């Protein structure tokens, strides 16, 4: 985002991750747990007031809504992500570690001309360009832990439990 001229706002689930983003150059970071967002009142009912609070917190940092939201957790945060995107903005979904049966208020999508797109990283040309950024030292990939092939189950469980940063 920084290399593309954008203003990133990182929304994370711990102070450790907030510090990691700051070390990587992200000036605007919100720790969901510190702010105690409760996007769900119960397992069936989302809390739009909490979405509004997140949007207000984002606007207090950068003065506007965000153009693009990279949505990773899935069920637990998707409604808030749809709400937080600016009019005409995009929500890019690239995973669903908190659940893949997604719910959101569609009025916040269609009434504000937002779109949802999916991504599974990149096509070959985009992957080459991303690798070139690494080779040129413009971005630093984050690898928090490595696993052997025999530890695939353990690795998947660590992702599910939100214990991994980066890839």
List where the protein language model places each region.
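Short beta->alpha linker loops
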Residues: 12-16, 33, 72-73, 97, ...
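Short, glycine/polar-rich helix-capping loops at beta-to-alpha or helix-loop-helix junctions
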Residues: 13-23, 100-106, 127
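Glycine/Thr-rich phosphate-binding loops of Rossmann-like dinucleotide-binding domains
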Residues: 39, 78-79, 101-102
